[in-house]
Every structure is written in structure tokens, then in C-alpha cells.
Design a protein with these regions (language model features):
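Bacterial N-terminal signal peptides
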Residues: 8-18
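Alpha/beta-hydrolase-fold serine-hydrolase catalytic core, especially in secreted/extracellular enzymes
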Residues: 240-243, 248-297
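N-terminal cap/lid segment of alpha/beta-hydrolase-fold proteins
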Residues: 23-66
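Short beta-strand element of the alpha/beta-hydrolase
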Residues: 65-76
Length: 297
């Protein structure tokens, strides 16, 4: 009887270890893992092979006292891989966020994946995070703050973000180098075909990060800002064009501003929020940026 019990216990431990090991299929550090206090890694998860997960490397630090808010990310050109944004996404994750980007992990070399993705992959990311938080066999069990979720994206990924922004689980929206076309159908065939009416479905504080007048999405994004009057909205412009600063070390200025927004909206960090609050807002001290805001302190 005792031997049988030992065998059952041993099998249980083996299966638990096997499950934990199977969750992370591949892992790679981007740059130095970010400047935040949690060194980040880029991973492929066995239970979500359709996405790339940027996460603090050591998640044992998260649980009862501090949990991981969720950021679902849509890529530029609606690519099915976040290869254009890895520096930016790794940097954000290093500040204690679970960033789930649409698409497969970028290759270390060679031609990157340029297949197209769909907006539903953002909600797939949210579904996965919630499921992982309640799965006792998951490394993320009870470590995720499922009540603090952002949807975000760049260019075509920004349109994907706006398409799913009505999801009641969403806590904040971040739209980068994007905006809804004034004339429906003016985008490429693979882009979400939205109208300005979609903006009325936003129900959370919203941040737009644009690349100034040289950004091909500038007019659309600024028009979105003008038409959003029912929620807090902040639009910031840096004169860098449509490409932003995502590929710069640690994601450059766009990562700094976006991370501050995420910290404020998803972690309740009032110090980070000072970048956006006040008259003038703290961002006014940074000569790289101009901004407008409404329905905000």
C-alpha cells in the first residue's frame, strides 16, 4: 500500500513538472531584458502558440501582493508576428506587465513572418490570460490581474485595438500611429473596416501616440481625438513619422510614455500619472512631445 502511494505521488510530481515545462516552448531575451525592475523575456507558450508573450523572467515575485496586468498588442501592418516592436514590448514587460502580442515569435535572423492577423487575436490573448490565471497547473496561476487589461496596437494594429475596444473586460486603450479613416474603406483590404461610429464604443481612458504631421496616420488619429468626447482621452505627438521609436533601444520615447500610461491606468501609479495630469501635464517638460487632452484632470 505504501509503495503504491509513493508511485502515485511520484507520478503526480512528474506530471506537474512536465506540465510546467511544457508551457514555455521557447524563450529569448530582447536587448538586456529592459530597464524595469523585472528582467523581461520573449516567449512562446505551448498553450498559446499563435501569440508571443513578453513577461518578467521571474514570475515568482508576483502573486498576492502584486499581480501582472495584461496588455494585448496588435502589430503594424496587422503582421502575424511582433518583429517590428520587440524592443518596445520587452521594455514595457520589464516594468511588471504581461504583454501578449499577436503572432508567432520573431525569428533571430532571416525573413520575418508577414502573414496577416485578425482583431479577434486580441481577444484570444485576453481569454488566454484569464484562463491561465485560474488554471492551477499554470505558472501564472493567481499571478495575473484579470481586472486590469489594456488593448493596444500600432498602425493597422491600432485599428484592431479600436475594433475590440468595446470589450467590457478592457480597462484602457492605447492607439499608436493610427486612427480610423475619415472615409470608410480607404485602408488596405486586410485592415479592419471601421467608421468613426466605432469610437462611441470606447468605454475607458484612451491614449493616442502619434508621430506628428509626418505620420501618415496623423490626420486620422487627431480626428479620432476630436470626436472622442465621452471618455478621458490624451493625444501625444512626437515628430518622428509613422515608424515611431519602437526599434530604438528599449523602445525609445514611445515606450517611456506608453509605460507611464500603463503604470497609471493598470497599476494605479499616481507618480507615473503625473505625466498626463495637471495643467500643464508633466509631459510638457519633455521637449520631444506636444500633447492635447480632455475629460482629464
Amino acid at each position: 500500500m505504501r509503495r503504491s502511494s509513493y508511485l502515485v505521488l511520484g507520478l503526480s510530481v512528474f506530471l506537474s513538472l512536465k506540465t510546467a515545462m511544457a508551457q514555455e516552448v521557447a524563450s529569448r531575451m530582447v536587448e538586456d531584458g529592459g530597464t524595469g525592475k523585472y528582467t523581461a523575456v520573449m516567449t512562446t507558450q505551448g498553450s498559446l502558440p499563435t501569440h508571443t508573450v513578453f513577461t518578467p523572467k521571474d514570475i515568482s515575485k508576483f502573486g498576492k501582493k502584486e499581480k501582472l496586468p495584461v496588455i494585448a498588442w496588435g502589430n503594424g501592418a496587422c503582421f502575424n508576428s511582433p518583429w517590428e516592436h520587440v524592443n518596445f514590448l520587452s521594455e514595457v514587460a520589464s516594468h511588471g506587465f504581461l504583454v501578449i502580442a499577436i503572432g508567432v515569435m520573431p525569428k533571430e535572423s532571416g525573413e520575418q513572418v508577414k502573414d496577416r492577423s485578425t482583431s479577434t487575436q486580441l481577444t484570444d490573448a485576453i481569454d488566454w490570460a484569464i484562463a491561465q490565471n485560474r488554471d492551477k497547473n499554470s505558472a501564472y496561476y493567481q499571478k495575473i490581474d484579470v481586472n486590469k487589461i489594456a488593448v493596444s496596437g500600432m498602425s493597422c494594429g491600432g485599428l484592431q485595438t479600436l475594433e475590440v475596444s468595446s470589450d467590457p473586460r478592457v480597462s484602457t486603450v492605447v492607439v499608436c500611429n493610427s486612427g480610423i479613416f475619415k472615409t470608410p474603406g480607404n485602408g488596405r483590404s486586410n485592415m479592419p473596416n471601421l467608421t468613426k461610429e466605432n469610437l462611441k464604443k470606447i468605454h475607458t481612458p484612451t491614449l493616442y501616440l502619434l508621430g506628428g504631421e509626418k505620420d501618415i496616420a496623423y490626420a486620422n488619429g487627431m480626428d479620432d481625438y476630436q470626436q472622442i468626447n465621452h471618455v478621458p482621452v490624451f493625444v501625444a505627438n512626437m515628430d518622428v513619422g509613422h515608424g515611431g521609436t519602437y526599434s530604438q533601444p528599449h523602445g525609445g520615447e514611445f515606450a517611456k510614455v506608453a509605460t507611464a500610461w500603463y503604470k497609471w491606468q493598470l497599476k494605479g501609479d499616481k507618480q507615473a500619472g503625473k505625466l498626463f495630469t495637471g495643467q500643464p501635464a508633466g509631459l510638457a517638460a519633455n521637449s520631444n512631445w506636444t500633447y492635447e487632452k480632455k475629460n482629464m484632470p
